[in-house]
UniProtKB/Swiss-Prot annotation:
Name recorded for this polypeptide: Serine/arginine repetitive matrix protein 1
Quaternary structure and interacting proteins, as annotated: Identified in the spliceosome C complex. Found in a pre-mRNA splicing complex with SFRS4, SFRS5, SNRP70, SNRPA1, SRRM1 and SRRM2. Component of the minor spliceosome, which splices U12-type introns. Found in a pre-mRNA exonic splicing enhancer (ESE) complex with SNRP70, SNRPA1, SRRM1 and TRA2B/SFRS10. Found in a mRNA splicing-dependent exon junction complex (EJC) with DEK, PRPF8, NCBP1, RBM8A, RNPS1, SRRM1 and ALYREF/THOC4. Interacts with DDX39B, CPSF1, RBM8A, RNPS1, and ALYREF/THOC4. Seems to be a compound of RNA export complexes that are released from speckles in a ATP-dependent manner.
PWI domain sequence ranges: 27-126
Species of the source: Mus musculus
Entry GO terms, CC: nuclear matrix; nuclear speck; spliceosomal complex
Function, as annotated: Part of pre- and post-splicing multiprotein mRNP complexes. As a component of the minor spliceosome, involved in the splicing of U12-type introns in pre-mRNAs. Involved in numerous pre-mRNA processing events. Promotes constitutive and exonic splicing enhancer (ESE)-dependent splicing activation by bridging together sequence-specific (SR family proteins, SFRS4, SFRS5 and TRA2B/SFRS10) and basal snRNP (SNRP70 and SNRPA1) factors of the spliceosome. Stimulates mRNA 3'-end cleavage independently of the formation of an exon junction complex.
Length: 946
């Protein structure tokens, strides 16, 4: 073809230039009508378009808008070319169809052209026919409708008449059967029962504060298994249990058992008020009614209100705990008002319960508000309450719910633990571990499960010792500390204020010896929470085992002696394993396996991290009650105190080997515990408020490291070695809560070094102590190094040097440089930490120099803290007087950071308005304290290192 073109073929011969349409016109066959021309101006195209569309659709088998519009466009021309239209349509319609289509279309156009209206005659005829048909159809339809309507009316009338007759004949029967309806009566009875349950729970929650007896009753129902616990736990859990039971009971009420339990529980409220500690009646009733229900109710109320509110909303209700914390501030006085021995137990239970969940007063006074949250938690717990078998579900539910609400558990773990401890002193240790661990497992199960068992054991020892004011006060203080730390971090202002207020008065009442015990107990609780947290955070498995161990051992050792127990408590985490076996009964209720789940739950680590810090402070408070105050003051820039407080507890661990030193430190630490506890209350609340507010995320992230570090370090040397560096890594951020603010990443490496060095140093220091004490002492040293590194990271290497970790000090120092402001505060804290370390390590290291430094720090910090904390001292005057000697170190250390932040922290909880006013002063004080702390750090570094 192309070649021909180039050869000289003509355009006609070349198909490229040929007129194809002409060829097509020649080739195609057209209808005869197409030869006629149509004037489209005379045609009503709108009438024809529907026909075209219909016809094209019939030909193509589907509606093709392109073809239809193409035809319309061609017809819009005044004189369309029919043949060209057919040629153009052959591409869309095949030749045959195109010819047929044009053969039909053109006649229509021609007829429309002739018609005046421009409508084809065919259409007119069709329309006429259609109209006729429509009329006929309409007539038919009308007649049919009339007939149908008549029939329907007749049918309806007949049906209505028959129905009326039937109804008339049946109505008397129905009315008779319905009116008597015993169902209604039974339902009203049930409703009344439910109401009585729900009301009684409400009334109980309302009457919790006035009457712990209902709580005791409910506790007594729970007592059946932990009857031993029941006395103290009945008191403590009375508040928490009454809250929980009240909230849960409305839910369990549907069960017939529940109504009777409620009635019984109401009766028991009155009876158990006198009985409150009479376990047999409450046990028999509880057991006969449903121990699982009643105890689950306790747990549910304490847990549901404390745990469930915090666990389930855990993150969410951490703020809510803050909300509750203001009421907590209010509750503490009522707790004291309510007979401190039982009241304290109740306070502990309620304080730990309501303290953990805005406990005693918040649970009591707020019990109604908490009821809904606890009720929310109680529904799952209903199942737990419903039957002992349900209690394992509770454990299971708690593991699941704890993951969410562990915060609640954090706050209430101690109280509940104390309640459970007292309730099931025999079996509660597992129950505590399982129950609290299960409950706290989400966060507090891991964090506070250990504290929970420990508090229970503490309560066991307390219940064994007194079940009375001292242990109750210690439990309440511990619980308050726990929930302070929890609330301080969750609601550090109000939580810390209420907790610090409660703890301070209790401490002032308890004072040195009792303050030491209570602090030790509370430290054991708080420490135990942190160990468990550490254990939990260290590894779910390790945490589980160690939690069980630590709670029991701690409780047993607590029983052995208030002062040694702190160290033993830390030791106890590993020794605790023997006691945990007895707790399995509580585990039965809580499902021993589920508690591990709760403990194991790695999800809670988030909560762990938040509550771990809280618990690590609680640990500090609990562990360091006697010696830790120094470390508390030393490492405890309030958050650091919590972080550093683990280091004081490590001192106990370390000082286990030198118990006498522990005791002497305990004396000083007892003094300082009140101060340190005050600082923890105030400054740690303050920082917990500050850092819990700003660093809470950090606390959750980095605190989890610390609590883990404390857990890992305190429970086993293996964890120490394995997790000590992890703790170092993680604790760097915890240890440098200030540093966390400054920088977290550098610290992990540094803290690893410090943790390793501190592990080595601690092992050296704690060579004499047992493996547990070594692991705890060694891990405490990492913890102390870490927490001290928190303070040291803040305060520099003086304390690491004191601990014989020159390498750690440098990392910590590098950390402290990262936290420039915090190093100054830690410097003083380091001073106090070095002193605090000195009691445990004075024998190992430069105790004299550190003690002198402690005295100096105490002097400086006393003046500073007295100036800064005049308000706090007024509030804490009684407690401060007791730890006045140790107070300088604890207060000075706390004053460095906590005095700086404690004015803000303690005033914030107690006097937020004052704390706001004091914040400006605190900033200046913090600057001065930081400067002095830096100076003291330098001195401490020189002397300890030398």
């Amino acid at each position: 073809m192309d070649a021909g073109f180039f050869r000289g073929t003509s355009a006609e011969q070349d198909n490229r230039f040929s007129n194809k349409q002409k060829k097509l016109l020649k080739q195609l066959k057209f209808a005869e009508c197409l030869e006629k021309k149509v004037d489209m101006s005379k045609v009503n195209l709108e009438v024809i378009k529907p026909w075209i569309t219909k016809r094209v659709t019939e030909i193509l088998g589907f509606e093709d808008d392109v073809v239809i519009e193409f035809i319309f466009n061609q017809l819009e021309v005044k004189n369309p070319d029919s043949k060209m239209m057919q040629i153009n349509l052959t591409g869309f319609l095949n030749g045959k169809n195109a010819r047929e289509f044009m053969g039909e279309l053109w006649p229509l156009l021609l007829s429309a052209q002739e018609n005046i209206a421009g409508i084809p005659s065919a259409f007119l005829e069709l329309k006429k026919e259609e109209i006729k048909q429509r009329q006929i159809e309409q007539e038919k339809l009308a007649s049919l409708k009339k007939q149908d309507e008549d029939k329907d009316k007749r049918d309806k009338e007949e049906k209505e008449s028959s129905r009326e007759k039937r109804e008339r004949s049946r109505s008397p029967r129905r009315r008779k059967s319905r009116s008597p309806s015993p169902r209604r009566r039974s339902s009203p009875v049930r409703r009344e029962r439910k109401r009585s349950h729900s009301r009684s729970p409400r009334h109980r929650t309302k009457s919790r504060s006035p009457s712990p007896a209902p709580e005791k009753k409910e506790k007594s129902p729970e007592l059946p298994e932990p009857s031993v616990r029941m006395k103290d736990s009945s008191v403590q859990e009375a508040t928490s249990t009454s809250d929980i039971l009240k909230a849960p009971k409305p839910e369990p009420v549907p069960e017939p058992k529940e109504p009777s339990p409620e009635k019984n529980s109401k009766k028991e409220k009155e009876k158990t008020r006198p009985r409150s500690r009479s376990r047999s009646k409450s046990r028999s009733r509880t057991r006969s009614r449903s121990p699982s229900h009643t105890r689950p109710r306790r747990r549910h109320r304490s847990r549901s209100r404390s745990y469930s509110p915090r666990r389930r909303p855990s993150p969410r209700r951490r703020p809510s705990p803050r909300r509750r914390t203001p009421p907590r501030r209010m509750p503490p006085p009522p707790r004291h008002r309510r007979s401190r021995s039982p009241g304290r137990r109740r306070r502990r239970s309620s304080a730990s319960l309501s303290g953990s969940s805005s406990s005693s007063s918040s649970s009591r006074s707020r019990s109604p508000p908490k009821k809904p949250p606890k009720r929310t938690s109680s529904p799952p717990r209903k199942t737990r309450r419903l039957s002992p078998s349900a209690s394992p579900p509770r454990r299971r539910h708690r593991p699941s719910s704890p993951a969410t609400p562990p915060p609640k558990t954090r706050h209430s773990p101690t109280p509940q633990q104390s309640n459970r401890t007292r309730k099931s002193r025999v079996s509660v240790s597992p129950g505590r571990t399982s129950g609290k661990v299960t409950k706290h497992k989400g966060t507090e199960k891991r964090e506070s499960p250990s504290p929970a068992p420990k508090p229970r054991k503490v309560e066991l020892s307390e219940s064994e010792e007194d079940k009375g004011s001292k242990m109750a006060a210690a439990d309440s203080v511990q619980q308050r500390r726990q929930y302070r730390r929890q609330n301080q971090q969750s609601s550090s202002d109000s939580g810390s204020s209420s907790t610090s207020e409660d703890e301070r008065p209790k401490r002032s009442h308890v004072k040195n010896g009792e303050v030491g015990r209570r602090r030790r107990h509370s430290p054991s609780r708080s420490a135990s929470p942190s160990p468990r947290k550490r254990q939990k955070e260290t590894s779910p498995r390790m945490q589980m085992g160690k939690r069980w161990q630590s709670p029991v051992t701690k409780s047993s050792r607590r029983r052995r002696s208030p002062s040694p127990p702190p160290a033993r408590r830390r030791r106890s985490p590993s020794p605790a394993p023997p006691p945990p076996p007895p707790p399995p009964p509580p585990r039965r209720r809580r499902s021993p396996t589920p508690p591990p789940r709760r403990r194991t739950p790695s999800p809670p680590p988030r909560r762990r991290s938040p509550s771990p810090r809280r618990y690590s402070p609680p640990i500090q408070r609990r562990y360091s009650p006697s010696p830790p105050p120094k470390r508390r003051t030393a490492s405890p820039p309030p958050p650091p105190k919590r972080r550093a407080s683990p280091s004081p507890p490590p001192k106990r661990r370390v000082s286990h080997s030198p118990p006498p030193k522990q005791r002497s430190p305990t004396v000083t630490k007892r003094r300082s515990p009140s101060l340190s506890s005050k600082h923890r209350k105030g400054s740690s609340p303050g920082r917990s408020t500050r850092e819990a507010r700003s660093p809470q995320p950090n606390k959750r992230h980095s605190p989890s490291p610390r609590p883990r570090a404390p857990q890992t370090s305190s429970p086993p040397p293996v964890r120490r070695g394995a997790s000590a560096s992890p703790q170092g890594r993680q604790s760097p951020s915890p240890s440098t809560r200030p540093i966390r603010r400054v920088s977290r990443t550098p610290e992990p490496k540094k803290i690893k070094k410090t943790a390793m060095a501190t592990q080595r140093n601690i092992r050296r220091v704690s060579k004499s102590p047992k493996a547990d004490s070594l692991s705890r002492a060694a891990s405490p040293s990492p913890q102390s190094v870490r927490r001290v590194s928190s303070s040291r990271s803040v305060s520099g290497s003086p304390e690491p040097a004191a601990k014989k970790p020159p390498a750690p000090p440098s990392p910590v120092q590098s950390q402290s440089p990262s936290t420039n402001w915090s190093p100054a505060v830690p410097a003083k804290k380091a001073k106090s930490p070095t002193p605090s370390l000195s009691p445990a390590r004075n024998s190992d290291q430069e105790g004299g120099g550190k003690k002198k430094k402690k005295k100096k720090d105490k002097k400086h910090k006393k003046d500073k803290k007295h100036k800064k904390h005049k308000k706090h001292k007024k509030e804490k005057a009684v407690t401060i007087a007791t730890p006045a000697t140790a107070a300088p170190a604890a207060v000075s250390a706390a004053t460095t950071t906590s005095a700086q932040e404690e004015p803000a922290a303690a005033p914030e909880p107690r006097k937020e308005t004052e704390s706001e006013a004091e914040d400006d002063n605190l900033d200046d004080l913090e600057r001065h304290l930081r400067e002095k702390a830096l100076r003291s750090m330098r001195k401490a570094q020189v002397s300890p290192q030398s």
